[in-house]
Amino acid sequence: MRNTLDNLLNAAGIVISDKQKNLLIQYVDMLNKWNKAYNLTSVRDPQQMLVRHIMDSIVVEPHLHGQRFIDVGTGPGLPGIPLAIVRPESHFTLLDSLGKRVRFLRQVQHELQLENITPVQSRVEDFPAEPPFDGVISRAFASLQDMISWCNHLPARTTGRFYALKGVLPQDELSSLPQGVLLDQVVRLSVPDLEGERHLIVLKPN
């Protein structure tokens, strides 16, 4: 698995330490093991997890600004745990409403000794942002409209951003953004060995 990860990182032009690579592989091992009992992801092959979960998450890292992030609807920790591993100077709150997912996140935190994540079991609407976050991240969570509606209380008013990971660019969602947010940036992401388009949509509170 290490050779596959090295090849993917080289293809993406991403440089991380051996320790970070080992942590990413440990995370995939744990996800694969727990997935058999808890059904945390539809991806069953660890090699595919490297592409569709690890690489698909960490290609976003250069586009994040700030130190405090919240990953809403994180599921088994995606993209929050891979991002926390490659961005150790930042802190990631991992929010999910399902107990089995949060139990998995806490076990990952314990076994990988990740000090820069905080798993939380809560509905996003009920979670207080005190203080507000630099970035609100979502991957396969909801439409842009729902994300903004449910998460509007989470980012800092002037400096905070919404980061939505999408496949094909959702032009219909972009054309009907609610009042109070502005489109800041659209980034076409390149994920080695992953078929289909990937985009990062960055929105800012107005």
UniProtKB/Swiss-Prot annotation:
Reactions catalysed according to its record: guanosine(527) in 16S rRNA + S-adenosyl-L-methionine = N(7)-methylguanosine(527) in 16S rRNA + S-adenosyl-L-homocysteine
Amino acids binding S-adenosyl-L-methionine: 73, 78, 124-125, 139
Enzyme class at the top of the EC tree: transferase
Record carries keyword Plastid: no
Gene3D superfamilies: Vaccinia Virus protein VP39
Cell compartment(s), UniProt: Cytoplasm
Keywords: Cytoplasm, Methyltransferase, rRNA processing, S-adenosyl-L-methionine, Transferase
GO molecular function, one term: rRNA (guanine-N7-)-methyltransferase activity
Pfam families linked to this entry: GidB
Record-listed E.C. numbers: 2.1.1.170
GO annotations of cellular component type: cytosol
Family per similarity comment: Belongs to the methyltransferase superfamily. RNA methyltransferase RsmG family.
Purpose: Specifically methylates the N7 position of guanine in position 527 of 16S rRNA.
Protein name per the record: Ribosomal RNA small subunit methyltransferase G
